[in-house]
C-alpha cells in the first residue's frame, strides 16, 4: 500500500509540474487587477461539482488576501443569484472538460446581463465551447486522474487548486499585500494572531 500511495503522490506532483505556464497567467492577473482594483469590481468564481468546490476555495482565498471575491453556483445563478454580478466584475469559470453545460449557460446568461464582464476560464481543453467563450483561458495540462476508474476528479482538482494558488500569490505581489493587510481581514485563530505579530499590530494595541 505504501508504494501505491507514493505512486499516487508522484503522479499528482508530475501533473503539477506539467501545468503549461503561458502568458495566460499574466493576462488573467491583469484582467482581475483591472476589474477589481482598478474599477472596484469583484472576482466572481464558478464551477460545477468538484470544480465548484475548488472555485469556492479560490474565491475565499482571494478575499482573504485583498482581492474581493465570491463564489456563484452556476445552477443557482439561473434562479436569481445571477443578480450578484455587477458591471465591473470579472468571472472566473472552472471546468476540466470545458463542456460543462451549466457553466456554458452561466456565461450566456452573463452576456445577456453584462456582456462587457470579462471571462477567465481554467480548463483541461482549449478546443471546447467554454474556451471559445473566454477572454482568457488557463490550461491545466489535462492530467490523467489517479482514480482507479480514471473518472473521479482527483488529479484535475489538485491542478486546479495549484493554479488558483498561483493566481492568488501573483495578485498579492502585484498589490503589495502584507501581514498588516492580512491581519485586518483574518483576525481570528492562529493565522490572525501570527499576522498581527508579523505586522506589529499586537504591540500597537497594548
What residue ranges belong to the model's regions?
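An N-terminal, well-structured beta->alpha segment
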Residues: 1-37, 41
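Glycine-rich phosphate-binding loops that contact phosphosugars or nucleotide phosphates
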Residues: 33, 42-175
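Internal, active-site/partner-interface "lid" segment
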Residues: 132, 146, 173-206
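Short, charged low-complexity intrinsically disordered segments located at boundaries
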Residues: 37-47, 64, 193-205
Amino acid at each position: 500500500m505504501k508504494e501505491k500511495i507514493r505512486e499516487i503522490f508522484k503522479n499528482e506532483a508530475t501533473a503539477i509540474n506539467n501545468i503549461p505556464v503561458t502568458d495566460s497567467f499574466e493576462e488573467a492577473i491583469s484582467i482581475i487587477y483591472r476589474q477589481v482594483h482598478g474599477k472596484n469590481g469583484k472576482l466572481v468564481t464558478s464551477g460545477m461539482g468538484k470544480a465548484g468546490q475548488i472555485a469556492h476555495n479560490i474565491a475565499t482565498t482571494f478575499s482573504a488576501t485583498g482581492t474581493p471575491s465570491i463564489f456563484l453556483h452556476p445552477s443557482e445563478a439561473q434562479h436569481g443569484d445571477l443578480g450578484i454580478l455587477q458591471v465591473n466584475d470579472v468571472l472566473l469559470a472552472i471546468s476540466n472538460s470545458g463542456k460543462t453545460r451549466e457553466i456554458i449557460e452561466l456565461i450566456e446568461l452573463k452576456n445577456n446581463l453584462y456582456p462587457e464582464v470579462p471571462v477567465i476560464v481554467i480548463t483541461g481543453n482549449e478546443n471546447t465551447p467554454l474556451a471559445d467563450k473566454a477572454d482568457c483561458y488557463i490550461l491545466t495540462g489535462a492530467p490523467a486522474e489517479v482514480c482507479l476508474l480514471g473518472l473521479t476528479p482527483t488529479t484535475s482538482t489538485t491542478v486546479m487548486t495549484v493554479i488558483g494558488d498561483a493566481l492568488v500569490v501573483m495578485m498579492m505581489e502585484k498589490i503589495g499585500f502584507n501581514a498588516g493587510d492580512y491581519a485586518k481581514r483574518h483576525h481570528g485563530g492562529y493565522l490572525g494572531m501570527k499576522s498581527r505579530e508579523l505586522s506589529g499590530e499586537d504591540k500597537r494595541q497594548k
